[in-house]
C-alpha cells in the first residue's frame, strides 16, 4: 500500500469509528474548543457537524472560518500512549443550506440517529469543514501529513 493510501485508510477508519471530535475556533486571538458529534465525507475532504446558532463556536466560526478539528481513538488508558491515533484536520468552516443540507443530514443521522430532533431544529446549523490538511499522530510522536488538493 502506498504511503498516501495508508494514511487515507487510517484516517477513514478513525473517522468512521469515532463519534465525537473537538472543534477549535478562535475570536480575538483567544482559542476556544468544543465537543461535537461529526461525520466525514467518504473522500475525507469535508467534516460535518451540527450546532445551535446560539453557541460561542457558531459565533466564532462565522467571524473567522479557520478551524481545527481533533479526532482521536484514546480510551483514557495508559495504553493510549502507544496505541491511540489522533488526527488534526485544518480547514475552513461554513454553514450549509438546502439542498446540500438535506443530503448531509441523511449521512449525519445514519451515524447519529439519536440526534435527529437536534439536527432538524430550526435553531441549529449544519456546518461543513473543508479540509486543507490532515495531521495524524501515532505512537505518541510519529506524525504523518496528508494535504487535500
Language-model segments: residues:
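Extreme N-terminal tail/first-helix region
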Residues: 1-21
Amino acid at each position: 500500500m502506498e504511503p498516501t493510501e495508508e494514511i487515507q485508510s487510517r484516517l477513514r477508519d478513525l473517522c468512521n469509528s469515532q463519534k465525537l471530535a473537538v472543534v477549535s475556533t478562535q475570536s480575538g486571538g483567544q482559542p476556544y474548543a468544543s465537543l461535537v458529534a461529526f461525520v466525514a465525507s467518504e473522500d475525507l475532504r469535508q467534516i460535518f457537524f451540527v450546532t445551535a446558532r446560539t453557541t460561542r463556536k457558531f459565533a466564532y466560526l462565522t467571524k473567522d472560518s479557520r478551524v481545527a478539528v481533533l479526532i482521536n481513538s484514546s480510551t483514557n488508558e495508559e495504553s493510549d500512549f502507544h496505541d491511540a491515533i489522533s488526527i488534526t484536520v485544518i480547514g475552513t468552516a461554513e454553514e450549509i443550506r438546502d439542498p446540500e443540507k438535506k443530503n448531509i443530514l441523511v449521512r449525519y443521522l445514519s451515524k447519529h440517529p439519536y440526534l435527529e430532533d437536534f439536527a432538524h431544529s430550526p435553531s441549529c446549523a449544519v456546518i461543513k469543514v473543508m479540509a486543507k490538511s490532515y495531521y495524524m499522530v501515532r505512537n505518541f510522536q510519529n506524525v504523518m501529513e496528508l494535504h487535500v488538493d
